[in-house]
Protein backbone atom coordinates (compact mmCIF):
# COMPACT_ATOMS: atom_id res chain seq x y z
CA UNK A 1 0.00 0.00 0.00
CA UNK A 2 1.38 3.37 -0.98
CA UNK A 3 0.36 6.49 0.92
CA UNK A 4 0.16 9.85 -0.90
CA UNK A 5 1.60 8.97 -4.33
CA UNK A 6 1.88 11.84 -6.82
CA UNK A 7 0.38 11.98 -10.29
CA UNK A 8 2.93 12.23 -13.13
CA UNK A 9 3.93 15.66 -14.36
CA UNK A 10 2.79 17.60 -11.33
CA UNK A 11 3.02 17.95 -7.60
CA UNK A 12 -0.60 16.93 -6.97
CA UNK A 13 -1.46 13.91 -4.86
CA UNK A 14 -3.29 11.06 -6.56
CA UNK A 15 -6.82 10.71 -5.19
CA UNK A 16 -8.16 7.61 -6.99
CA UNK A 17 -8.79 4.46 -4.96
CA UNK A 18 -6.68 2.34 -7.33
CA UNK A 19 -3.89 3.31 -9.72
CA UNK A 20 -1.85 1.49 -12.33
CA UNK A 21 1.91 1.79 -11.93
CA UNK A 22 2.83 -0.04 -15.15
CA UNK A 23 3.57 1.05 -18.68
CA UNK A 24 1.48 -0.67 -21.38
CA UNK A 25 1.54 -1.14 -25.14
CA UNK A 26 -1.38 -2.15 -27.36
CA UNK A 27 0.18 -4.84 -29.55
CA UNK A 28 -1.11 -6.21 -32.84
CA UNK A 29 0.19 -8.77 -35.37
CA UNK A 30 1.94 -10.95 -32.80
CA UNK A 31 2.50 -14.60 -33.71
CA UNK A 32 2.88 -16.03 -30.18
CA UNK A 33 2.57 -15.04 -26.51
CA UNK A 34 5.03 -12.90 -24.58
CA UNK A 35 6.49 -14.53 -21.45
CA UNK A 36 6.27 -12.80 -18.04
CA UNK A 37 9.69 -11.59 -16.78
CA UNK A 38 11.30 -11.68 -20.22
CA UNK A 39 13.11 -8.60 -21.53
CA UNK A 40 11.47 -6.79 -24.43
CA UNK A 41 13.21 -4.43 -26.83
CA UNK A 42 12.42 -1.99 -29.62
CA UNK A 43 14.75 -0.03 -31.89
CA UNK A 44 14.00 3.65 -31.25
CA UNK A 45 15.60 6.99 -32.12
CA UNK A 46 19.00 7.10 -30.44
CA UNK A 47 19.22 3.44 -29.44
CA UNK A 48 17.14 0.62 -28.01
CA UNK A 49 14.21 0.76 -25.58
CA UNK A 50 14.25 -2.06 -23.03
CA UNK A 51 11.68 -3.26 -20.51
CA UNK A 52 10.57 -6.30 -18.52
CA UNK A 53 7.23 -8.00 -19.18
CA UNK A 54 4.83 -7.99 -16.23
CA UNK A 55 1.81 -9.38 -18.07
CA UNK A 56 0.50 -10.21 -21.53
CA UNK A 57 -3.28 -10.23 -21.97
CA UNK A 58 -4.74 -11.37 -25.28
CA UNK A 59 -7.68 -9.44 -26.74
CA UNK A 60 -9.51 -12.73 -27.36
CA UNK A 61 -9.02 -15.07 -24.37
CA UNK A 62 -8.54 -18.73 -25.21
CA UNK A 63 -7.06 -18.11 -28.65
CA UNK A 64 -3.37 -18.65 -29.21
CA UNK A 65 -1.71 -16.44 -31.83
CA UNK A 66 0.16 -18.27 -34.59
CA UNK A 67 1.99 -17.20 -37.76
CA UNK A 68 -1.12 -18.05 -39.79
CA UNK A 69 -3.54 -16.31 -37.39
CA UNK A 70 -1.72 -13.42 -35.66
CA UNK A 71 -3.21 -12.04 -32.46
CA UNK A 72 -3.30 -8.85 -30.46
CA UNK A 73 -3.39 -7.79 -26.84
CA UNK A 74 -2.02 -5.56 -24.10
CA UNK A 75 1.59 -5.90 -22.99
CA UNK A 76 2.31 -4.41 -19.54
CA UNK A 77 5.91 -3.81 -18.54
CA UNK A 78 8.30 -1.97 -16.22
CA UNK A 79 11.51 -0.08 -16.90
CA UNK A 80 14.18 0.01 -14.21
CA UNK A 81 17.21 2.34 -14.50
CA UNK A 82 19.41 -0.39 -13.00
CA UNK A 83 18.49 -2.99 -15.63
CA UNK A 84 16.99 -1.38 -18.74
CA UNK A 85 19.63 1.13 -19.81
CA UNK A 86 20.96 1.50 -23.34
CA UNK A 87 24.19 3.51 -23.41
CA UNK A 88 23.35 4.89 -19.95
CA UNK A 89 19.81 5.98 -20.91
CA UNK A 90 16.43 4.37 -20.22
CA UNK A 91 14.65 4.93 -23.52
CA UNK A 92 10.87 5.02 -23.93
CA UNK A 93 9.10 2.67 -26.33
CA UNK A 94 7.75 4.45 -29.40
CA UNK A 95 4.41 4.34 -31.16
CA UNK A 96 5.84 3.05 -34.42
CA UNK A 97 4.43 0.33 -36.63
CA UNK A 98 7.80 0.10 -38.39
CA UNK A 99 9.76 -1.09 -35.33
CA UNK A 100 8.46 -4.23 -33.62
CA UNK A 101 8.69 -4.91 -29.89
CA UNK A 102 10.43 -8.27 -29.48
CA UNK A 103 10.71 -10.62 -26.49
CA UNK A 104 14.20 -11.99 -25.81
CA UNK A 105 12.99 -15.46 -24.69
CA UNK A 106 9.85 -15.90 -26.75
CA UNK A 107 11.33 -14.23 -29.86
CA UNK A 108 7.87 -12.75 -30.38
CA UNK A 109 7.78 -9.65 -32.57
CA UNK A 110 4.71 -7.49 -32.06
CA UNK A 111 3.68 -4.27 -33.74
CA UNK A 112 2.53 -1.25 -31.73
CA UNK A 113 -1.09 -0.48 -32.63
CA UNK A 114 -0.08 3.17 -33.18
CA UNK A 115 -3.52 4.33 -34.35
CA UNK A 116 -5.30 2.85 -31.31
CA UNK A 117 -7.93 5.42 -30.29
CA UNK A 118 -6.59 8.18 -28.05
CA UNK A 119 -8.05 8.19 -24.56
CA UNK A 120 -9.31 4.60 -24.82
CA UNK A 121 -9.42 2.82 -21.45
CA UNK A 122 -8.47 -0.87 -21.56
CA UNK A 123 -7.35 -3.11 -18.68
CA UNK A 124 -6.92 -0.12 -16.37
CA UNK A 125 -4.74 1.81 -18.83
CA UNK A 126 -5.55 4.92 -20.85
CA UNK A 127 -3.96 4.57 -24.29
CA UNK A 128 -2.71 7.31 -26.60
CA UNK A 129 -1.34 6.15 -29.96
CA UNK A 130 -1.04 2.59 -28.64
CA UNK A 131 0.97 3.52 -25.52
CA UNK A 132 -0.09 3.98 -21.88
CA UNK A 133 1.91 5.49 -19.02
CA UNK A 134 1.67 4.78 -15.27
CA UNK A 135 -0.97 6.71 -13.34
CA UNK A 136 1.41 7.55 -10.51
CA UNK A 137 4.82 9.17 -10.42
CA UNK A 138 7.71 6.78 -9.98
CA UNK A 139 9.31 6.78 -6.51
CA UNK A 140 6.59 8.97 -4.98
CA UNK A 141 4.57 8.31 -1.84
CA UNK A 142 5.34 6.34 1.29
CA UNK A 143 5.30 2.54 1.26
CA UNK A 144 3.26 1.74 4.36
CA UNK A 145 2.53 -1.97 3.86
CA UNK A 146 4.11 -4.81 1.91
CA UNK A 147 3.59 -8.52 2.26
CA UNK A 148 5.52 -11.24 0.46
CA UNK A 149 4.07 -14.67 1.03
CA UNK A 150 5.79 -17.81 -0.13
CA UNK A 151 4.06 -19.94 -2.73
CA UNK A 152 1.90 -22.76 -1.38
CA UNK A 153 1.50 -25.65 -3.79
CA UNK A 154 -1.94 -27.24 -3.67
CA UNK A 155 -3.39 -30.25 -5.45
CA UNK A 156 -6.41 -29.58 -7.70
CA UNK A 157 -8.57 -31.86 -5.53
CA UNK A 158 -7.25 -30.58 -2.19
CA UNK A 159 -9.83 -29.58 0.41
CA UNK A 160 -9.15 -26.85 2.95
CA UNK A 161 -10.83 -26.71 6.36
CA UNK A 162 -11.21 -23.33 8.00
CA UNK A 163 -12.39 -23.16 11.60
CA UNK A 164 -13.38 -20.02 13.42
CA UNK A 165 -13.99 -19.86 17.16
CA UNK A 166 -15.81 -16.82 18.51
CA UNK A 167 -16.18 -16.36 22.26
CA UNK A 168 -18.26 -13.79 24.12
Residue ranges and their predicted role:
Residues 1-168:
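Interface-prone segments of viral and bacterial extracellular assemblies
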Amino acid sequence: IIKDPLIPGGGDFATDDTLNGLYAVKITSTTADYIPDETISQTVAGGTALGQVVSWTRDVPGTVPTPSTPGSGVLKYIQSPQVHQNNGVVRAFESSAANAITGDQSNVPGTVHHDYANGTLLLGCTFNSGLASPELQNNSGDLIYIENRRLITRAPDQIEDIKLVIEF
